[in-house]
């Protein structure tokens, strides 16, 4: 069987092409109109800006997604070390609608009463030593003498910047508590010698990739971060891990000085159990949205999502 190609007469071809052109133009116009409406809809959607500690990135992800899904609010996030996040408010006037920090004392020291009138503690954590299967001398790591492993000359230790991130000054507090408890003069200095400037990052969550890439053998981390990243970690004794509420007085015997609210200022930070807190700043551009998001995070569903994200969430206030 053979087929014969059929060609339209010239006039018919022209009319057919004109119909196709009109149909295409109509489709493009409709798509453009829908796109414009979508763009206008996105622009008109309520917005809430959230600034949070780097160690909250994973726990907050699902909770913020769920809030956006339920409310249609556009959630814009900023992640930084808690001290840096606070100074964006005090020094730059960059005020979010909600701020969540890894140390409640940052609120008390830098933000209350000029920038925040009240804050709510919502989670706890503890310090650990994070590592990977390829970390040097990991087989020798134990909770009774971990610092000796970290102080070996071929070991690379990571930590966060104590002037930007609470994990950084908590690292120093852990070392000072350990030195005091075990009577090991020079312990802090010997461990920090394995953590030169190249191993220091603005926030503790930045150390995860370096550990996974083998650039670091060990890092001072929060337990929640090590768990969510799939890292191995060494649990420290409760006398030094800043995770035991009953040991608050013992932790307070260690102290470090860090930069304050403005250039040239400094504050003294004492050891304390690790508490996360959040607040709506006084000059929040979208304060009502910030309050609604705060209430969602503190609600039973919000707390459940944060717990699933690896946080040790405290009981409702």
Report residues per predicted region.
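Short, Lys/Arg-enriched N-terminal segments with co-localized hydrophobic residues
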Residues: 11-17
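Bacterial N-terminal signal peptides
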Residues: 22-33
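Serine residues within intrinsically disordered or low-complexity segments
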Residues: 2-3, 16, 32
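Exported/periplasmic ABC-transporter solute-binding proteins
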Residues: 36-92, 103, 111-112, 132-317
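Short polybasic linear motifs
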Residues: 2, 8-9
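Short, solvent-exposed loop/turn segments at the edges of secondary structure
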Residues: 124-125, 273
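Short beta-strand-centered segments that line the small-molecule binding cleft or hinge
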Residues: 92, 96-103, 107-121
């Amino acid at each position: 069987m053979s087929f014969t190609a059929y060609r339209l007469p010239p006039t018919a071809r022209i009319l057919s092409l004109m119909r196709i052109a009109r149909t295409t133009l109509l489709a493009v116009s409709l798509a453009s109109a829908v796109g414009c409406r979508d763009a206008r809809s996105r622009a008109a959607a309520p917005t809430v800006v959230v600034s949070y500690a780097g160690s909250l990135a994973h726990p907050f992800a699902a909770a913020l997604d769920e809030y956006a899904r339920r409310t249609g609010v556009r959630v814009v996030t900023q992640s930084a070390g808690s001290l840096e996040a606070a100074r964006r408010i005090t020094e730059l006037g960059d005020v979010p609608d909600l701020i969540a920090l890894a140390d409640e004392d940052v609120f008390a020291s830098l933000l209350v009463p000029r920038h925040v009138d009240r804050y709510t503690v919502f989670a706890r954590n503890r310090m650990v030593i994070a590592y990977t299967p390829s970390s040097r001398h990991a087989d020798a790591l134990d909770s009774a003498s971990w610092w000796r492993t970290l102080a070996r000359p071929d070991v690379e230790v990571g930590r966060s910047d104590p002037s930007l991130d609470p994990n950084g000054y908590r690292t120093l507090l852990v070392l000072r508590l350990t030195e005091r408890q075990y009577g090991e003069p020079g312990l802090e200095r010997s461990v920090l010698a394995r953590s030169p400037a190249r191993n220091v990052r603005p926030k503790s969550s930045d150390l995860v990739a370096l550990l996974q890439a083998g650039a670091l053998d060990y890092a001072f981390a929060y337990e929640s971060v090590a768990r969510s990243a799939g890292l191995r970690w060494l649990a420290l004794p409760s006398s030094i891990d800043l995770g035991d509420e009953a040991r608050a007085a013992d932790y307070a015997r260690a102290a470090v000085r860090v930069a304050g609210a403005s250039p040239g200022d400094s504050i003294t930070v004492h050891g304390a159990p690790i508490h996360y807190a959040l607040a709506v700043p006084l000059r929040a551009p979208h304060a009502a949205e910030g309050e609604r998001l705060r209430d969602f995070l503190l609600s039973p569903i919000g707390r459940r999502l944060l717990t699933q994200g690896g946080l040790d969430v405290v009981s409702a206030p």
